[in-house]
Design a protein with these regions (language model features):
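FIC/Doc superfamily catalytic core
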Residues: 1-304
Length: 304
């Protein structure tokens, strides 16, 4: 009985309390066995869809058109997750005209500007990978600065917390202290670029996305930066040649479940459920991107 009480007391102290900074956030990978039969099946289906997408992209006569179209859709959806809403017409108009002139004249909204900055950050990350196939803290900062158009760096202030938008209840408090945050990011870099494991990269993509969001290194722009990192990681690992996975489409369609599972990993280490969700996101959005390519090809054929 005494032993049971001691175990329960230990578990209570180890539990992450929502209003306490999560400075004890463990480094990746998790200690539990992730490669169950169910998850490996889901990962295989996601990998198959990515392989088909990669193969089709290699046959495109004008991949730049595809990159522009998909990147714009991903930018719009990822920004919508943060309640930044705009229209495709406004975005395409800004592409063919001078964005800064349109903004100064009031002919484009600040929301559209933020969406286009996301696309710019996606391109910037992809171009950096072509030069140096590494995902680093400095790159994370550059992506956020491009999205937010500021010179902010790692979050220094304390008291940052995530609240339920409906109730105001604190649901999560990320790590505090610049040194602590930088150490967490360094550990994440090591997991990404020099992994001491043989986990499937699609599982790793799910893990690193949670970890980045849990570290919450910036005052703003964490969600969008984290979603760019997922796509860049798949490029780094050779699953994609181009940054064209429309993953935010699945997340926005399942937004409540996405945030519920992020919280579940923190509260009860629900890694299996989280990784299954993300594997399904990869599979469905790879198929969605394939359908988009088919529509682009039909449109090109009609023009020619």
């Amino acid at each position: 009985m005494l032993l049971l009480f001691a175990v329960m007391l230990t578990a209570l102290f180890e539990m992450q309390l929502p209003h306490h900074p999560y400075n004890t956030l463990p480094a990746l990978p998790p200690t539990q066995d992730l490669e169950t039969a169910t998850l490996l099946k889901a990962v295989a289906q996601a990998a198959r869809a990515l392989g088909e997408l990669k193969g089709v992209c290699q046959t495109l006569p004008n991949p730049a058109l595809l990159i522009n179209t998909i990147a714009l859709q991903e930018s719009k959806a990822s920004s919508a997750i943060e309640n930044i809403i705009t229209t495709h017409d406004e975005l395409y108009q800004a592409i063919v005209q001078d964005l800064d002139i349109m903004l100064a004249s009031g002919t484009i909204s600040p929301s559209a500007k933020e969406v286009l900055r996301y696309r710019e950050a996606l391109y910037e990350g992809y171009n950096e990978l072509q030069k140096r196939n590494l995902l680093t803290t400095n790159l994370f900062i550059r992506l956020m600065q491009t999205i937010k158009q500021n010179s902010a760096g790692i979050r220094k202030e304390s008291g940052v917390c995530i609240k339920n938008q409906m109730t105001g209840e604190i649901v999560y408090t990320p790590p505090e202290g610049e040194d602590v945050i930088r150490q967490k990011l360094y550990e994440l870099e090591q997991f990404i670029n020099d992994p001491p494991h043989d986990l499937n990269p699609i599982i790793c993509m799910a893990l690193l996305h949670y970890q980045f969001e849990a570290i919450h290194p910036f005052a703003d722009g964490n969600g969008r930066t984290g979603r760019i990192l997922m796509v860049l990681y798949l490029v780094q690992q050779g699953y994609l040649d181009l940054p064209i996975l429309f993953v935010s489409a699945y997340i926005i369609k399942n937004k409540a479940r996405y945030y519920e599972l992020l919280r579940a990993v923190t509260e009860r280490e629900a890694w299996q459920e989280w990784c299954l969700f993300m594997a399904k996101a990869v599979e469905e959005t790879a198929q969605l991107t394939l359908h988009t390519i088919q529509r682009i090809r039909i449109a090109q054929d009609d023009i020619t």
